[in-house]
Regions:
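Polytopic membrane enzymes that build or remodel cell-surface glycoconjugates and lipids
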Residues: 2-683, 690-692
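Long amphipathic alpha-helical scaffold regions
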Residues: 666-674, 699-710
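Alpha-solenoid repeat scaffolds
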Residues: 265, 597, 711, 728-729
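Boundary/linker segments of alpha-helical solenoid repeat arrays
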Residues: 644-645, 678-679, 709-717, 742
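TPR/TPR-like alpha-solenoid helical repeat scaffolds
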Residues: 713-728
């Protein structure tokens, strides 16, 4: 080799990389930067061209909380995800994402003030001249304006998705003690292509943060018994205030404790006790969340709950109604275009939901086709109960639960038969790493002698911080009362508004905390330590993954509750937490099996590499659709050609670029797919009107006004163009007839 120094450098670098990933313990600190880097490389949007895409216009541009200076920073708890009040909400109460978005905007405001007060005027003039030369006619944007754009806001998604991947790595290493399994788990999750919508789209931050709460709740199970309920409480509360889907953590966290306690605490597993303690922590978080949401965001009841049950209803029906009234979920919109299952009878609705589930699950494994929209008639209501996809979906929803139960029983049987002597847990205290960094020595005799002491004090400080921090947080949240801006909202009738007084919530939390401290202390202090334990992690983790998949998907399935949308890929963020556990185990098993083959053992790395490369490649390609709104809707309508909404939105983006003939063609496709959709008729008429063909537009306008008589926005849009082209008077009689008819 002509350049031996280059060869030596590459060899040394390769050895360091191998040591980092195969020898160094796969802790959260070790996985932090690799997972965030991978997240950024796969999902970051193209800065020069990206703009507000899909729901981002409503979430950022149209959000009153973000754009009106009359709102204080803390007022996020009194508004829904879109910044709307309780009487105008569509049921999405997620204050944590709004706090993040507003925080970035306020950071821009403070930064702009520093610039205005400290940058010389001559520099500002020079910058303005440079900006004008590069962007003629465009005003200079301020920092707050830049912070409101989708690109800086979506950096939150990239960061927290990487954090979730790092948590996966750390938890997998804690359970398996294998670097291979740990890195496969984190990489499988971060590269899951079906999550592209949640990570690349700004609105997906709710799903990402909800997933963060779920992963933190799982990580909390590794803490000591008297700390664990407090950590679970905080984690679940974070998830719930980020997205309502985190409600699945209430049953799933105890299941995880039941399945994994013997691996996380091999000397004192106490399965049932730890599962009970985690249930207390998660249930208390759920109760506090519901009570605070009702206090801060007093919405009305859905119409189906506002009416009483029919005489003769079962006791179970009465209990369920009482629970739903107490839960007090804001009414969800029901639009046949976004969710065709709203008009389907219960049996066909379940069949359609099973079909959607089967298709989504196939995308998790083989994401060849991905889309940002699946509106009517792409996912129509089925006309028959039994067909291949409904049967497959039902089997994949019920089968994993039965398989998980069988795996759990088999794991218990193996645990009793095959035990190994306990190995001491190697700790890596943060303080030791910090001391080694300051002394510039990876091994220092005096530091290594103090490692157990440093680890003990770090653990104690962490436990005290978790217990007292959680208690302080719960108390402070419970002291925040309702807002005057919401005083006239909500149900005033007592039978529709079940509320607990704040002192009762305080008492409940205090008694629960004391009970958890007492029981947890008994477990850690009096439980007889084991000297042997089962170390096989595969069956319990696989069982948890299967249960997690089904249970976490069920709230999104449209079986129990009809959602505003029939299908969305971002809704798979929670279920993919479960599929990741199973897929990582399969990949590691495939690698190990291939490694044993005499001829092909050296190529075992191909097994996980092919799968992860395909997933990462599809994730990257799908993220390129977020370059701008035109590309997004073009790729969407190509992926789901039967979605009327995709074609119509693509036509709007074409019209914004004055490509009128193409807009007309796409509008007509949308109209053909959804002939009863008022918006498609009006938008087609508006296209013809703006093309200078107002005579042809009237037939579409008239049909659209007749099909959507209460949609003022559509009516104003049509009348405006008719007025501009001096054709409004020509149709005055017909307009008055429509007005009288409706």
């Amino acid at each position: 080799m002509r350049f031996p120094w280059l060869r030596n450098t590459l060899k040394t670098g390769w050895e360091q990389v191998k040591h980092y990933f195969s020898v160094r313990p796969a802790t959260f600190a070790a996985a932090f930067w690799p997972m965030i880097t991978l997240s950024v490389l796969l999902y970051i949007r193209y800065l020069p061209t990206t703009n507000y895409i899909f729901d981002e216009q409503e979430a950022l541009l149209g959000n009153p909380y973000l754009n009106q200076p009359t709102f204080k920073y803390g007022d996020a708890i009194y508004r829904d995800f879109w910044g709307l009040p309780a009487n105008a909400s569509i049921g999405s109460y997620r204050p944590v994402p709004n706090l993040l978005w507003r925080g970035l905007i306020e950071f821009g405001e403070r930064g702009q003030a520093l610039i205005d007060n400290n940058i010389p005027a001559a520099w500002k003039v020079s910058y303005a001249n440079l900006h004008e030369s590069m962007n003629p006619g465009r005003p200079v944007e301020t920092l707050p304006d830049l912070m409101k754009k989708s690109w800086p806001q979506h950096l939150f998604n990239l960061f927290f998705h990487g954090i979730n991947g790092a948590l996966f790595v750390a938890m997998a290493y804690r359970l398996s003690r294998r670097n291979l399994v740990a890195w496969l788990a984190g990489t499988t999750f971060v590269t899951a292509a079906i999550l592209t919508e949640a990570v690349s789209g700004v609105v997906g931050i709710a799903d990402v943060l909800g997933g963060l709460g779920a992963l933190l709740a799982l990580a909390a199970l590794s803490t000591r018994a008297y700390v664990m309920p407090f950590a679970v409480f905080s984690a679940v509360l974070l998830g719930l205030f980020s997205k309502e889907s985190a409600i699945v953590c209430v049953p799933l966290t105890p299941v995880a404790a039941l399945l994994l306690s013997h691996l996380l605490h091999p000397d004192k597993p106490a399965r049932l006790v730890r599962a009970g303690l985690s249930l207390v922590g998660a249930a208390l978080a759920f109760i506090v969340y519901v009570e605070l949401r009702k206090r801060w965001f007093p919405s009305s009841l859905p119409s189906e709950l506002a009416e009483g049950l029919e005489p003769g209803s079962s006791a179970a029906s009465h209990y369920m109604r009482e629970f739903m009234v107490w839960f007090h979920q804001a009414p969800l919109p029901k639009d046949r275009l976004n969710n065709p299952l709203v008009d389907a009878p219960p049996d066909l609705r379940v069949a359609g939901a099973c079909r959607v589930y089967a298709r989504g699950l196939s995308q998790v494994v083989f994401p060849w086709t991905l889309s940002g929209d699946y509106s009517y008639p792409q996912e129509p209501a089925p006309t028959e109960l039994i067909f291949p996809e409904s049967v497959l979906g039902w089997f994949m929803m019920v089968g994993p639960l039965g398989l998980a139960l069988g795996l759990f029983v088999l794991a218990l049987k193996r645990e009793w038969k095959h035990r190994e002597p306990l190995r001491p847990h190697v700790v890596h205290p943060f303080g030791v790493g910090l001391a080694q960094w300051f002394t510039k020595k990876s091994r220092h005799s005096q530091i290594e002698k103090q490692t157990p002491v440093i680890a003990l004090w770090e653990r104690r400080l962490f436990e005290v911080a978790v217990i007292f921090g959680t208690a302080w947080l719960a108390y402070k949240l419970n002291t925040v009362g309702p807002s005057e801006m919401n005083k006239d909202f909500g149900d005033k009738e007592l039978d529709r508004n079940i509320l607990f007084p704040s002192h009762a919530v305080n008492d409940l939390m205090a008694y629960g905390a004391c009970a958890c401290l007492f029981v947890g202390g008994l477990v850690e202090g009096l439980w007889k330590p084991r000297t042997t334990a089962a170390t096989d992690y595969r069956l319990p983790v696989a069982a948890l993954g299967l249960v997690w998949l089904v249970v976490s998907y069920f709230p999104h399935s449209n079986i129990a509750v009809l959602l505003p949308t029939v299908r969305a890929e971002r809704l798979w963020y929670f279920p993919v937490l479960g599929t990741t556990m199973v897929i990582a185990l399969l990949l590691s098993a495939g690698f190990d099996r291939a490694k044993e083959l005499r001829r092909w053992g050296s190529y075992a790395w191909i097994v996980p590499t092919v799968f992860l490369t395909f997933q990462g490649g599809r994730a990257y390609l799908q993220s390129t659709a977020y370059r701008d709104d035109l590309i997004f809707w073009r790729d969407t309508k190509n992926a789901v050609p039967n979605s009327a909404k995709a074609h119509l939105n693509y036509s709007v983006m074409l019209g914004a670029r004055s490509r009128w003939q193409e807009r007309l063609e796409e509008s007509l496709i949308a109209l053909e797919l959804a002939p009863d959709w008022a918006m498609a008729h009006v938008y087609t008429g508006d296209t013809l009107c703006r093309m200078g063909r107002p005579e042809e537009s009237w037939a579409y306008y008239k049909t659209g006004f007749d099909k959507g008589p209460n949609d003022k926005g559509l009516i104003v849009l049509g009348l405006q163009c008719l007025w501009d082209t001096k054709h409004l008077k020509l149709h005055e009689e017909e307009l008055r007839a429509l007005s009288e008819a409706h």
